[in-house]
Design a protein with these regions (language model features):
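N-terminal acidic leader/helix
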Residues: 1-38, 66-71, 75
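Acidic, low-complexity, intrinsically disordered interaction modules
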Residues: 32-54
């Protein structure tokens, strides 16, 4: 993976979510490596920018990211 920042990786994930989860797993892997490199423990996502911003959508996203080893918070 290239040296991508956490904020760039999160932006790529927003774009992927809007494009029917295209390459989502690759973007999650990039986010995970960026978080490890920068020492960030949790990725913060804006609820208003999610495709499905309700509780069910947030919990589904949180669960999927947890399976990939990424802790998610919503603001």
């Amino acid at each position: 993976m290239n040296d991508i920042t956490v904020s760039d990786a999160i932006e790529a994930i927003y774009a992927s979510l809007k494009n029917d989860n295209e390459e989502l797993d690759a973007h999650i892997a990039a986010l995970k490596s960026a978080m490890a490199r920068e020492g960030v423990k949790e990725a913060a996502f804006e609820t208003s920018r999610l495709v499905q911003p309700n509780r069910q959508g947030r919990k589904l996203m949180q669960s999927y990211f947890r399976k990939k080893g990424v802790a998610v918070a919503f603001v």
